[in-house]
Amino acid sequence: MSRFMIRAVFFRRYTAATVGKPFRNVAEVKQYLAKQTWSIDEILHGEDTGKAAKQGVPTEEEVRKLLALCAFPVEDADLQNSKRILVKQLSFINKLHETSVDDQDKNLDENYARLLPRQNKALTYDDLLKKIDGIKQDEATGEPTGSWDSTGLAKMRKDNYFIVRQGLLKNRK
């Protein structure tokens, strides 16, 4: 029995996971716990949802156009659910835009702050084409294979702008 307990203690000792730097004293723990944090519920269900609703909930026609633009099925779509999801996404984006992180960036150690680099190289048109070629459409999200070619209508390039002269103007008044 005691041999089993020793194995259990030994096993637990070497399987512990750590995240970030360890705390060195109680003051660091108190300082860490005193920092203001966000709750996802506050962000998505707080006052910002009301702001997004005041800014304008997308109409059913706008939701249909967005679904068609994304090549999702429009006929069998749950428009009310899509509207609710759009309002949540808009409120989350608004919250991110309102948050100032400039003061915090000075003290951040990038090794513990982000998984992606902060400064990224600008993409060129050729880089975008390579990335697009590698994208696989997901049938689970309703994307039919080969439904939309994002660069197929761009026939001309001038001053880093891509000119589309056909296809998109069919249903305009």
UniProtKB/Swiss-Prot annotation:
GO process annotations (BP): glutaminyl-tRNAGln biosynthesis via transamidation; mitochondrial translation
Taxonomy, superkingdom: Eukaryota
Keyword Membrane: yes
Compartments (UniProt record): Mitochondrion inner membrane
Primary localization: mitochondrion
Gene Ontology CC: one annotated term: glutamyl-tRNA(Gln) amidotransferase complex
Function: Allows the formation of correctly charged Gln-tRNA(Gln) through the transamidation of misacylated Glu-tRNA(Gln) in the mitochondria. The reaction takes place in the presence of glutamine and ATP through an activated gamma-phospho-Glu-tRNA(Gln). Required for proper protein synthesis within the mitochondrion.
Quaternary context: Subunit of the heterotrimeric GatFAB amidotransferase (AdT) complex, composed of A, B and F subunits.
Family: Belongs to the GatF family.
UniProt name for this protein: Glutamyl-tRNA(Gln) amidotransferase subunit F, mitochondrial
